[in-house]
């Protein structure tokens, strides 16, 4: 349910409580460029999209603060709610003059932006909550179809609701759905590397039973691929390989706090990944951060650290990396 997903986000914040003790001030980027506040006022910023210099941000709720679809006007740093939209949103993307927004069990398409509201909107696809969990991040593929993940129903077993534990693609006109990849516990955000027909997807590993070694994943969601969940959670790579499940591009080992890859975005072959809990070293947890790696997997490097709260959003646009955390702020840095 949406309530369960919202609760899960808040629960992740509790898991990553060590991250909230970061030093005061702004996050710090390894490239030496200053990190600046781009916008404030979004409870749980999950995804950002741009129409020219206007930004649209999807926001989940946090405690008593509603989420929803927000906009940030050029020259302003205050996020405002788009009128007549629901108080919860988990994904947003701009494509060919239209804004696509995920309100949990409904994806709507907007156009005719006046600077303060949209003049037109329609429902692209809708499910009843009793039959469906939720959509996650939104991203268009080079084939012109809208890709998204479908959320978990249970922590460590397969969901029984429509399309649960899968990545799907949607026809942007008819709303017809096609299953792309299955066996994914909680696919979250997606990105397409230039030249690739399949998205890279962040996937959150299971939390139970206590002490589970199930890692978080980044996968390449190719048509027909099965990544094994719940039969395989990639805590035993050899066992998963013997069962012929498709291998993830990379894994983040289980830790406390959990790394929890959320937002993912590409600049060429380089990936920027938002880690809700961050990596852990011999000296202890780094805290929420943005890391870089290759679209083929490989070395993971710290890129932006020092967030005061768990970080969810990562989006590369126009020479800047945009990042958002549970303090309600969206930042940007040249990257």
Where are these regions (language model features)?
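Blade-loop segments of beta-propeller domains
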Residues: 67-96
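Residue-level marker for isolated small/hydroxyl-bearing positions within beta-strands
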Residues: 58-60, 102-104, 149-151, 202-204, ...
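Beta-propeller domain segments
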Residues: 23-29, 135, 151-158, 162-175, ...
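Sec/Tat signal peptide C-region and signal peptidase I cleavage site
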Residues: 15-21
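Asp-box/WD-like beta-propeller blade repeats and closely related beta-sheet repeat scaffolds
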Residues: 105-140
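A short beta-strand motif characteristic of beta-propeller blades
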Residues: 34-40, 78-84, 122-128, 176-181, ...
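Bacterial N-terminal signal peptides
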Residues: 3-14
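Beta-rich, blade/repeat-based domains predominating
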Residues: 41-54, 85-102, 129-146, 182-198, ...
């Amino acid at each position: 349910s949406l309530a369960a997903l919202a609760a899960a986000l808040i629960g992740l914040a509790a898991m990553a409580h060590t991250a909230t003790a970061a030093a005061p001030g702004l996050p710090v980027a390894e490239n030496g460029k200053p990190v600046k506040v781009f916008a404030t006022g979004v409870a749980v910023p999950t995804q950002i999209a741009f129409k020219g210099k206007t930004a649209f941000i999807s926001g989940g709720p946090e405690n008593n603060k509603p989420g929803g679809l927000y906009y940030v006007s050029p020259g302003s740093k205050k996020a405002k709610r788009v009128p007549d939209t629901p108080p919860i949103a988990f994904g947003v993307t701009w494509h060919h003059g239209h804004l696509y927004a995920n309100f949990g069990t409904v994806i709507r398409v907007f156009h005719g932006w006046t600077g303060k509201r949209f003049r037109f909107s329609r429902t692209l696809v809708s499910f009843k909550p009793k039959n469906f969990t939720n959509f996650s991040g939104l991203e268009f593929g080079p084939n012109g179809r809208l890709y998204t993940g479908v959320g978990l129903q249970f922590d460590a077993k397969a969901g029984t609701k429509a399309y649960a534990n899968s990545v799907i693609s949607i026809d942007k006109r008819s709303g017809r759905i096609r299953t792309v990849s299955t066996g994914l516990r909680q696919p979250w955000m997606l990105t397409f590397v230039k030249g690739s027909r399949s998205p890279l997807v962040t996937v959150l590993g299971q939390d139970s039973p206590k002490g589970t070694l199930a890692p978080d994943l980044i996968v390449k969601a190719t048509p027909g691929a099965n990544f094994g969940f719940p039969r395989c959670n990639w805590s035993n790579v050899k066992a998963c390989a013997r069962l012929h499940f498709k291998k993830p591009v990379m894994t983040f080992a289980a830790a406390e706090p959990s790394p929890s890859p959320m937002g993912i975005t590409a600049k060429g072959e380089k990936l920027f990944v938002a880690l809700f809990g961050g990596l852990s070293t011999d000296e202890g947890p780094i805290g929420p951060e943005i890391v870089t790696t290759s679209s083929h997997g490989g070395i993971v490097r710290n890129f932006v650290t020092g967030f005061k709260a768990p970080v969810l959003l990562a989006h590369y646009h126009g020479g800047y990396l945009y990042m958002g955390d549970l303090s309600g702020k969206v930042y940007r840095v040249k990257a």
